[in-house]
Every structure is written in structure tokens, then in C-alpha cells.
Amino acid sequence: MPMTLGYWNIRGLAHSIRLLLEYTDSSYEEKKYTMGDAPDYDRSQWLNEKFKLGLDFPNLPYLIDGTHKITQSNAILRYIARKHNLCGESEKEQIREDILENQFMDSRMQLAKLCYDPDFEKLKPEYLQALPEMLKLYSQFLGKQPWFLGDKITFVDFIAYDVLERNQVFEPSCLDAFPNLKDFISRFEGLEKISAYMKSSRFLPRPVFTKMAVWGNK
């Protein structure tokens, strides 16, 4: 019985989950919900099902795997990762993992907050000014390692790829000063399962955000 991943028909919070499902060769199907156009942005496709799925905290994305019904994107990632030994093992690795998971979510939210703000054009320069310092910290944290926890890929690398690459989409030159982050992106995209997925019709790199966003809505 394949797992079911439910989310809007966008990249959004599901990108790293889809990538991890593909990398682990998991059997899954997607339930993609479509949001209506402006000005109403009708969400009835999702709202009609929201409280009928048996979710403890009904939200998108969700993952249903038999009797396991999970919401919260990082909880979903951790669930898949545990099945495939893609979590940190030592105390040091788990500390790095926990820090990174939350740090990348902060960075993800900063970009999302900007892109949904009606004053996007006014606020964009401030974001771009702060971006190099943020990326510098990630570059230092990665160092000369191939993956963020060391020699072994883990689920936080999937979050890292999503956040770093969407900033690269937002500002194409942002990683130029950080060759190890650029190499990380290339290394990730070069993984056999990831490369195959990116060439498939299932791959959904855009739109980054919902139709309500000022940037990344197409």
C-alpha cells in the first residue's frame, strides 16, 4: 500500500519531502490540492477534506502511511528518515541535526515572509543585504564535509538543499561567494535517484509559493 502525501500543487513545504521519498525509493502517491485564483483564493478542495482524514492536527502537508497519519513537514521528514537510517547517529551528529533543522526553517520562513509581503519590492533590498551573512554561516557549518553532518547524507541535507536552492532561484548569484555550498547543490542534484526525479514529469520545482505570494507564485 503506497503512502499518500497531501499538499498544494506547488513546491512549498513539500519539496524536501518529495525529494526524500524519491531518494529512498519509497512507494507513494500524491494528493495535490489546487488553490483558486485571486481575489478569493478558493481553498475548498482542501477544506472539504481537512477534517475527514483522521489527522490529529489537520494541515498541509500530511503523510498517511497505513495507520500512521502525520502532519508538520519536519515530522514527516524524520518519519521517512528513520525508516531508511538517514538520521544522525552520534550525540554530536544529532545536535548538529537539531540545530540545522531549526535554523534552516528560520531561513525558509524569512524568505517566505518577504515573498508574501505586499511591500515586497521595498523590503527585498534589506533581505538581499542580509543574505550573504546567513549563507556564510551555513558555509562555515558545512566546511569541507560533503554533507552537513559529515560523510553520510541525512534528512537535513534535503532541507538544506531546498532552502539554499530556492534562495539561488530568488537571487541566482547568491552562492557565488560560497563554493562549498555550490558544490553541495551540485552533489545533491547529482545523486542518481534525485537526478532521475528531476528529469521526470513528477518533478515540481515551481511555483515556489501559493498564488497569494507576491514573488514565486508562478
From Swiss-Prot:
Chain residues that bind glutathione = Y7, W8, R43, S44, Q45, W46, K50, N59, L60, Q72, S73
| Protein name (database record) | Glutathione S-transferase Mu 2
Q: Catalytic activity annotated for this protein?
A: RX + glutathione = an S-substituted glutathione + a halide anion + H(+); 11(S)-hydroxy-14(S),15(S)-epoxy-(5Z,8Z,12E)-eicosatrienoate + glutathione = (11S,15S)-dihydroxy-14(R)-S-glutathionyl-(5Z,8Z,12E)-eicosatrienoate
EC nos: 2.5.1.18
Pfam families per record: GST_C, GST_N
PROSITE patterns, sorted: GST_CTER (PS50405), GST_NTER (PS50404)
UniProt gene name: GSTM2
Q: Which residues bind substrate?
A: Y116
Among Gene3D superfamilies, the record links this protein to: 1.20.1050.10, Glutaredoxin
Q: Tell me which GO cellular component terms the UniProt record holds.
A: cytoplasm; cytosol; extracellular exosome; intercellular bridge; sarcoplasmic reticulum
Organism field: Homo sapiens
Q: Which UniProt keywords apply?
A: Cytoplasm, Lipid metabolism, Phosphoprotein, Transferase
Matching entries from InterPro entries are given as: Glutathione-S-Trfase_C-like (IPR010987), Glutathione-S-Trfase_C_sf (IPR036282), Glutathione_S-Trfase (IPR040079), Glutathione_S-Trfase_N (IPR004045), GST_C (IPR004046), GST_mu (IPR003081), GST_superfamily (IPR050213), Thioredoxin-like_sf (IPR036249)
Tell me, how does this one assemble? Homodimer.
Q: Where is this site: Important for substrate specificity?
A: T210
For this UniProt entry, the molecular function terms from Gene Ontology, in alphabetical order, are: calcium channel inhibitor activity; enzyme binding; fatty acid binding; glutathione binding; glutathione peroxidase activity; glutathione transferase activity; protein homodimerization activity; transmembrane transporter binding
Known function: Conjugation of reduced glutathione to a wide number of exogenous and endogenous hydrophobic electrophiles. Participates in the formation of novel hepoxilin regioisomers.
What tissues is it present in?
Muscle.
Where, by residue number, does the polypeptide cross the bilayer?
A: none
* Domain of life according to the entry: Eukaryota
- Where is the protein situated, by its record's location annotation? Cytoplasm
- Tell me the ranges covered by the GST N-terminal domain, including all copies: 2-88
* Cysteine pairs bridged by disulfides in the record: none
Q: Residue positions of the PTM Phosphoserine?
A: S27, S44
